[in-house]
Amino acid sequence: RGKQVGAFVWSDKQGKNLLVLAEQVSERDDDGAQSAFVYAAQDLLDGDRPKRLWMLYDDVQHCEFDAGAHFNSDATRVTDLLGDGISQVTVGYSRTCTSDVSPNDFKLIMHIGKSQKYRLRGIDRYGASWWDEDAGALQGMPLPKDCSIAAQQALVSQYKEQGTELPLPGCYGDEEDFAKAPKPYLEFMRQHWFTLMQKQDTDWSQQQTPAPAEDDQE
């Protein structure tokens, strides 16, 4: 399915595991619309044939602008947070259908075995800041340090951006998936989310900031 963009093999208490990631952006249809998708699957390789543990598929259908669906390679992690030999597999990806430069939908998803899945869903930092020639500085709200509703609303008030929809760029909507999850899962996912957003924010800001002009040489 699509173009393979990642493959990972490891062993844990369940046996030998294979994780495959793929994505694709289609050519435009006759009417100019475009589609895109991401695909991921984890298989157990022990035995005569692979045993599918889970599959992920998400897409953008019939986008009249520019469609996109891409894995964030820094998001892929295999962990053993409980120390019981059972792996948690985390992947993250963005989706968009837009005609301008603006944040993408972003999902960070953790799978454990065949049936457990925990998600953080929000928007990333792509396009969240821009260079203001007159001010000679980057403009836009900074990356929130806390994605609670109160913290996001405080940032909106501070920057006098009342009416801004939540979540803010770089934040997720809620942590409801983790209500009954082991505490280390949410702690890891929170930290991982902000690490990814901080890196993206830094990379984006560097792209927007003009390079210093070289002194004229005589």
Q: What residues fall within each predicted segment?
A:
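Short amphipathic beta-strand/extended segments with alternating polar/hydrophobic composition
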Residues: 47-64, 119-130
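A short, structured loop/turn motif at beta-sheet edges
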Residues: 77-87, 111-117
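Surface-exposed turn/loop modules enriched in turn-prone residues
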Residues: 29-58
